[in-house]
Amino acid sequence: MKFYVVALALLVAFVCIAESRSVETERAVDADLEDDLDDLEEYLEGIAEALELEDFPDTEEARGETFDKLKEKLKTFYQKLVEKAEDLKGDLKAKLS
């Protein structure tokens, strides 16, 4: 989620930079864009540090491990639920007989 916030901020910044430019020479635009991109890079690095995203691949790895654990717990829960349903079904048949 944090990654998407940073990506959205980057996209908005690029759109704002593109919209705010008036007709200038190509060199002046390139120089201004380079300065703006440097400022934007510093700003986004600050955001990433604040959100502790500098090790994002590790974060993705951790999410994968968490998802695998959750998947195993859900599978175990489902198996117990099926067993319980079979027990209840057997009890119901016994009572009806």
Curated annotation (Swiss-Prot):
| PTM entry text | Cleavage of the propeptide depends on the processing quadruplet motif (XXXR, with at least one of X being E).
Q: What is its main location?
A: secreted
**Positions of short motif Processing quadruplet motif:** 60-63
Task: Offer an example of a GO molecular function term for this protein.
Answer: toxin activity
Tissue localization of expression is:
Expressed by the venom gland.
Q: Which residues form the propeptide?
A: 23-63
Where is the protein found, in the record's own terms? Secreted
* Keywords for this protein: Secreted, Signal, Toxin
A GO CC annotation recorded here is: extracellular region
What family is reported? Answer: Belongs to the cationic peptide 03 (latarcin) family. 07 subfamily.
Physiological role: Does not have antimicrobial or antifungal activity. Does not have hemolytic activity against rabbit erythrocytes. However, it causes some conductance changes in planar bilayer membranes, without membrane rupture, suggesting a cytolytic function on other biological targets. It causes paralysis, but is not lethal when injected into insect (M.domestica) larvae.
Return the protein name. Answer: M-zodatoxin-Lt7a
What species is this protein from? Lachesana tarabaevi (Spider)
